[in-house]
């Protein structure tokens, strides 16, 4: 799937649901309490982060989209902390404050990046559902997507009023469901249960085929536009009417904490759809975003630059013609898997059998082969007027089609030295009958511990000779 970064700055989203404050106490523990067999934590640092629906809104704002939030809090210090954090992040938050009940707070005691204890301060809210619906309806004209972030804490009392109000305005409704009754989300454009939540409703799924069949039945029963089941290390499965199931593998490199991963999924989906992305592409972006956020500790948001890097890395993992930034990310990924990077360069104006043999030999020097290609202006400077015969785009396209070549990148200078300083290959390869020290860029590569190898040329294979022969016949 080809992914690209949406214009999130043109993506207003309204989030309605259960807001809460995630509070963290970080400290050191080196002894057991004499009062009970529990560790003693000496608190050194504390921090507050928006949680629940507030984290969804925070994630949307972090991507550069406009986030509006409607929720319910107490009238207390925790609500003030939540409001201040959201305001600083650019979230337009509208809270229904209740005097008689506290803001929901999840306190986590941490030591050495490990969670030792969680303490919940909460009571189910007795929400003024009618007033909340009025607030939501007054904001729908300003947004392109409505998100229902339901944690079952009482902020959402009448889901159907909100869903129907949005549908009447042709605004997609995304719901992150909770509980044992998904009928309350009837008519939603998309719901995003995790596998456990999904199986609570439909029963255990023995395999993907059963998951798909039960998911399609649920969609029909509840008049859902689509269903996205998040499946942890097994990725995500998107179901749509009349379309084959789309299974996306998990993209996490390392998993430190899954807290808030569901919030990240629905927030990225909402922002991408509001920015005009088609649903499969939005799901692909959400899958990448989830892979990033589980690598962070605690409730966290991802930024637009982080997602952009992930998109570029995803495209860079494919073989073919890449820009420099994509190439560097692809190299980073390859090295993370212990792969040896080989680099060679040239004009490759008219690709011939000698080139093919040489590139196959170059590829055999390592695991990944990068081919640097002189752009048109540098070929003209090196080869003279009338060259290149083929434009740089055509030359790179032909090279990218060879099985021996992983990545192709162009450079504007006459030599690849500047490119070598950025790419830093493990092996620099050149074809010819000269010594290693005569290879352009050899000193750069050897300075950081890389290798330089010279391969023999295939006899009777010369682009210049081929060009001259064509001209004589013409």
Swiss-Prot record:
It catalyses: D-glycero-beta-D-manno-heptose 7-phosphate + ATP = D-glycero-beta-D-manno-heptose 1,7-bisphosphate + ADP + H(+); D-glycero-beta-D-manno-heptose 1-phosphate + ATP + H(+) = ADP-D-glycero-beta-D-manno-heptose + diphosphate. InterPro entries: Bifunc_HldE (IPR023030), Carboh/pur_kinase_PfkB_CS (IPR002173), Cyt_trans-like (IPR004821), PfkB_dom (IPR011611), RfaE_dom_I (IPR011913), RfaE_dom_II (IPR011914), Ribokinase-like (IPR029056), Rossmann-like_a/b/a_fold (IPR014729). Pathway: Nucleotide-sugar biosynthesis; ADP-L-glycero-beta-D-manno-heptose biosynthesis; ADP-L-glycero-beta-D-manno-heptose from D-glycero-beta-D-manno-heptose 7-phosphate: step 1/4; Nucleotide-sugar biosynthesis; ADP-L-glycero-beta-D-manno-heptose biosynthesis; ADP-L-glycero-beta-D-manno-heptose from D-glycero-beta-D-manno-heptose 7-phosphate: step 3/4; Bacterial outer membrane biogenesis; LPS core biosynthesis. The active site is at 263. Its EC number is 2.7.1.167, 2.7.7.70. Residues 1-318 are annotated as: Ribokinase. Residues 343-474 are annotated as: Cytidylyltransferase. One of its GO terms (cellular component) is cytosol. GO terms for biological process: ADP-L-glycero-beta-D-manno-heptose biosynthetic process; lipopolysaccharide core region biosynthetic process. ATP binds at residues 194-197. The keyword Transferase applies. SUPFAM superfamilies: Nucleotidylyl transferase (SSF52374), Ribokinase-like (SSF53613). GO terms for molecular function: ATP binding; heptose 7-phosphate kinase activity; heptose-1-phosphate adenylyltransferase activity; phosphotransferase activity, alcohol group as acceptor. Transmembrane segments: none annotated. Pfam families: CTP_transf_like (PF01467), PfkB (PF00294). Keywords: ATP-binding, Carbohydrate metabolism, Kinase, Lipopolysaccharide biosynthesis, Multifunctional enzyme, Nucleotide-binding, Nucleotidyltransferase, Transferase. It comes from the Bacteria. Catalyzes the ADP transfer from ATP to D-glycero-beta-D-manno-heptose 1-phosphate, yielding ADP-D-glycero-beta-D-manno-heptose. In the N-terminal section; belongs to the carbohydrate kinase PfkB family. Homodimer. This is Bifunctional protein HldE. The gene is hldE.
